[in-house]
Amino acid sequence: VKHFQERRKAKANAEPIAEEAVEGTDGISRNYRSEVLAILMKRPPAGFERLAQRILREAGFTQVTVTGQSGDGGIDGFGTLQVNPLVSFKVLFQCKRYAKSVAPTQVRDFRGAMAGRADKGIIITTGTFSAEARREASRDGAPPIELIDGDRLLEMLERLELGLKPVTTYEVAHQFFREFAA
């Protein structure tokens, strides 16, 4: 619990990702999911890769590094996931700021770039994955690739409270006050 409290404090002091969000006249953000996706689409590739790095670190990965190189074979970064004191996995990741679907050829190309370099791969996109790409990612006999589409990416930002701040709203419970009418 203390670990999560410390992480929450650090996040509160961190620079927000969604600082460009548009607010309604009452100060409440409207349709924040599409706003966040629009913000991410405007980020340069290196910025989106650094966001992926931050998400992976917050999710428990260690030694997360962005390669930041052209000619990297589609590998945007790597990290280590320590499952327990005895087992860890080297994981490579690729980032795609897409409004469209990621195709199965892109999953195959990423897997080819991974060959002999990691135990697992992750492709993170602002878009979606075609059904064929999903099948390719989990193909028998091939290293597994985790697919994180735009919806799942937003869920991770929400859960980790990165670039998003939860807001509590209150509704009047009239029934409660009625008992004090007389």
Residue ranges of predicted features:
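Mixed-charge (Asp/Glu-Lys/Arg
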Residues: 1-182
